[in-house]
Amino acid sequence: VKDAISEAKALLHAALPVGSRHAPLGWEALRAWERSHAVVLPEPYRMFVAEIANGTDIGPPDEGGLLPLGEKPQSWAVWEADCWMSPEPFDGTGARTLDRPFPLEEEWQWEYDYYDHGLHSSLLHKTYQHGSVLLGTDRPGEYWTLVVTGPQRGRVWWLRDGCAAPYADSPSDPPAGDFLHWVRDWHVGQGWWRAG
């Protein structure tokens, strides 16, 4: 276990340079945040926020780096017609409910089957507002989240208008889609960030 923790720390230090890191939150403040939200963050993200950085200026996602714990990007509460094909999926100004389970277990492309607002609006709201912390945004309307509650706990998910998908090719291999692998793939230019 100590070797895995040391390897995770080394990779996160190498991937995210000191000059790009915000001050770490510290263990006491992190535990207080977790108590106030009734969740325990998954490792190694938990250790990263407490000991290495509570947000970064560069890194995944590509626009602005990692958000500080609990923060939302500016575009979270702004609806621009060119970024959103679906009806407004959630109240972006409302509080996020982290202790309720993230509702999805596999990719969902609602842009193809959003024919019933009454049927889909509750699930869409939960997808954006329940059980995950926001990691950042690639651009307005595209967000990376880390699931903190429910069966997908520990997995990174990509949310965009019309689709929500887990990071990694195989849902049966959760470690490939966790925070550490997501950062590593960005750092070495593979997976999502592979040059086209």
Please report, for each region that a protein language model flagged, where it lies by residue.
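Basic, Gly/Ser/Thr-rich N-terminal segments that form RNA-phosphate-binding interfaces in CRISPR RAMP
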Residues: 69-70, 150-151, 180, 194
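Long, compositionally biased interface segments
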Residues: 166-196
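Segments surrounding the PLD/"HKD" phosphodiesterase catalytic module and close analogs
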Residues: 143-177
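Short, glycine-/Ser/Thr-/acidic-enriched flexible segments
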Residues: 140
